[in-house]
Amino acid sequence: MDLIKDIRLFEKLEPDVSCTSLPTYMRGLYGFDDMDMQDIIQRLLFSLRHEGFTLGSFDHLYMNYTPSLPHGEVRLNQRGRDPYFPWYRFTDAGCDIDIFRAMSMEEQRRFLSETIRKAVRLYADEANIAIFDRCYERVVELGADLEIPYKEKTGEHLHLTISTTISDEVDFLPIVRIFDLDGRLLLEHRMRSYGRDEFILQFRTITLGKKTAKIAISKSQDARYYDIKPLKFTI
C-alpha cells in the first residue's frame, strides 16, 4: 500500500455519476480558489507521509464539493474505482453555495478541512485514522510554526536530520541539523525558501563522513528547471 501522495479539491453543481463530465477544480462555483487551501494540505500531506499514513488501495484523495448533497454530508462517490486510473478516488461532500459564500475565509478553510477528515474515515483503517487525527490536530494547532520531519541518516560519526516548516504562502523552509552520536547538536542551518517540487528535488540523498555531510540533488529530469546544487557542510 502506497503512502498518501495528494489531496485535491473539486466542485460540481449536479450529482457526479458515471457517464457525466468529471468535476472541475474548486475555483468558480463557490467563489473559493482551491489554492487557498494548499498551505494546510501540504502541511498535512508531509506530516502524514512521515507518519506512514495510507488510504489503502489508492493514494490520491479527490474531494468533490457539490450542492446536490446536504451541507456537510460526506459520502462515497458513485463513480467508484476508475479501472484505468486506480490511484485516485473522488469523494462527495455536500456544500451549500449560499452557506459557504457567507462564511469567512477562516470558516471556509475549517469546513473544507473537516470534510477531508470525514472522507478519510470512509477509507482508512483504525490505525491510519489515528495517524490522521494526530497529524491533523498538529496542523490546526501550529500552522506555519509546525516543523515537519522529512529525512534523517546516521553514519559512523554523525547523525543528520532534515525538517521543514511550510509558510502560509506555501514556501518550504528547510532546517538541516547535524548531531554527534551522543545527540549533541553540532550544526544547525536554516535554508532559503523552496517551492514544493524544488524542495523534494534538492533534499534527495544524504552522505555522511567523519566531519562532513553532503546532500545530493535528484537526478530527475525535472531538476534541470531549478537552480539547485548539492549542499555540503563541514563540522
Predicted features and spans:
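Short glycine/acidic-enriched loop and turn motifs that connect beta-strands
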Residues: 166-169, 220-222
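Short, surface-exposed coil-to-beta transition loops
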Residues: 171-174, 201-202
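Acidic, small-residue rich beta-repeat scaffolds with periodic aromatic anchors
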Residues: 1-114, 197-235
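Structural core positions within WD40/WD-like beta-propeller blades
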Residues: 158-162
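Surface-exposed loop/turn elements that mediate protein-protein interactions on large endomembrane-trafficking
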Residues: 125-142, 174-193, 220-235
